[in-house]
């Protein structure tokens, strides 16, 4: 499974670390002959099987997934590498993993499956390109897109009418984050609480028509915050319910600040607006029949 291959990039021929894992097979990087991945040579994953990156590697060369699945299973698995899932290739996260990659090309034709985890891209990926990838992965709303960024866990949840999605953050330092999330979880801490309510209200984007982000309350990726997003916020039933993405054996309870009277009042207004919108939509639907 260990091979040296020549790749042509522009006018330069470079060596590459090629790891082939056959269909129906799962191997860790150690089993594939690479207990550590380091240096500047690119890594190329081939074959229809799954390669699991278990170590904290220092590889600075790019990582391309041509076929099959490359699963990240360490918080620093490819912290300095640009990860490129090509058409026919998938990058996935181990359950509940929170990891960092050096860069990510989620619009290169392949798929990134966050499962119920979180990935931070250190540099190189713009918020615009990140949202483009998320919208592709969302597909028709079922989170079963064949390219971009998706979540197989969100897809399973949505299939049983449990509202889940992929949330995202522009961290302000050149890095961006994407994670399995519930609508309303503005800060991606896997809770919907007063901090999220404050974000939804304090940024002043609700019904303003101004461009907005997930942090500011845009949960359906249409670039604005409106009654549809308020409906998404309240539709999860998760407000003040604790952690909704707790690993087995871990506590799902965390202390949060008490909401102010003003926050509660504003939430009530937004909530009633969302309820009114839903009732209006139902009446219109009955009328059409």
Regions found by a protein language model. Give the residues of each.
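Surface-exposed loop/turn positions within long extracellular repeat scaffolds
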Residues: 1-14, 28, 34-40, 52-142, ...
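Short domain-boundary/entry signatures in modular proteins, especially
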Residues: 7-17, 177-186, 216, 257
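Glycine-rich phosphate/pyrophosphate-binding loop
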Residues: 141-179
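Carboxylate-dense, calcium-coordinating segments in secreted/extracellular and ER-lumen proteins
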Residues: 191-200, 226-232
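A cross-kingdom C-terminal cell-surface attachment/processing module
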Residues: 261-279
């Amino acid at each position: 499974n260990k091979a040296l291959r020549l790749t042509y990039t522009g006018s330069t021929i470079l060596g590459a670390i090629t790891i082939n894992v056959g269909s129906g097979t799962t191997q860790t990087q150690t089993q594939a002959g690479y207990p550590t991945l380091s240096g500047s040579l690119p890594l190329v994953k081939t074959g229809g099987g799954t390669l699991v990156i278990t170590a904290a590697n220092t590889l600075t060369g790019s990582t391309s997934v041509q076929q099959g699945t490359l699963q990240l299973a360490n918080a620093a698995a490819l912290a300095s590498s640009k990860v490129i899932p090509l058409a026919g290739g998938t990058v996935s996260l181990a359950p509940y993993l929170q990891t960092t990659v050096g860069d990510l090309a989620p619009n290169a034709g392949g798929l990134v499956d966050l499962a119920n985890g979180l990935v931070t891209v250190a540099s190189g990926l713009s918020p615009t390109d990140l949202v483009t990838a998320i919208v592709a992965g969302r597909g028709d709303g079922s989170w079963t897109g064949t390219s971009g960024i998706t979540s197989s866990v969100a897809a399973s949840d949505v299939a049983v009418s449990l509202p889940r999605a992929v949330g995202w953050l522009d961290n302000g330092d050149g890095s961006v984050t994407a994670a399995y999330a519930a609508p309303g979880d503005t800060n991606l801490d896997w809770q919907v609480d007063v901090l999220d309510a404050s974000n939804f209200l304090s940024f002043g984007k609700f019904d303003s028509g101004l461009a907005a982000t997930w942090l500011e309350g845009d949960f359906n990726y249409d670039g604005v915050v409106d009654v549809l997003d308020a409906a998404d916020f309240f539709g999860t039933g998760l407000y003040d319910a604790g952690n909704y993405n707790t690993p087995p054996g871990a506590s799902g309870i965390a202390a949060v600040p008490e909401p102010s009277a003003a926050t509660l009042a504003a939430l009530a207004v937004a909530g009633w607006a969302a309820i009114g919108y839903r009732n209006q939509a139902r009446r219109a639907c009955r009328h059409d029949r």
